[in-house]
């Protein structure tokens, strides 16, 4: 049975965008784990997060609390989260890590490289785009370009991101969200 870790900074992202993927993986008899911050930074209520955790449990999905901060500038908190993530990876042999969100994606790809686990990163819209503030380009573009080289499959949501990723990012594979999911 394939074991897949679905990783994001916060639980609300998994709830709002990944439940169909989680169900699909379970239907394919994958052992699915979700790792994210169930406590802080979510854009849904604590009650909704509790319901979401119950839904995951009913599907047989294992949950891991990772204390990520949404901001990349909370370095100590995110360093602790990275240590927690590495502990999860040490405890279970994962066949794939599916990363979402900029912070979760960076730490997930770093950990995947350290543990030699194939990694998928879905960019739900790069923070650098035509018309974005210069600050976004200076901060996010070089980081995403660097970590794309540690990415087996980079999935983009919109055509601008896809075109830029193909031309500049150099992931092993780049796909549009409109293509079939790579599981």
Q: Where do the language-model regions lie?
A:
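Active-site proximal beta-strand in glycosyltransferases
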Residues: 3-5, 112-129, 144, 155, ...
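N-terminal strand-loop element at the rim of the active site
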Residues: 6-77, 161-164, 175-176
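Alpha-helical elements of Rossmann-like donor-binding domains used by nucleotide-donor carbohydrate transfer enzymes
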Residues: 20, 51, 80-87, 107, ...
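Nucleotide-sugar donor phosphate/pyrophosphate-binding loop at the beta->alpha transition
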Residues: 76-83, 118-120, 128-146, 150, ...
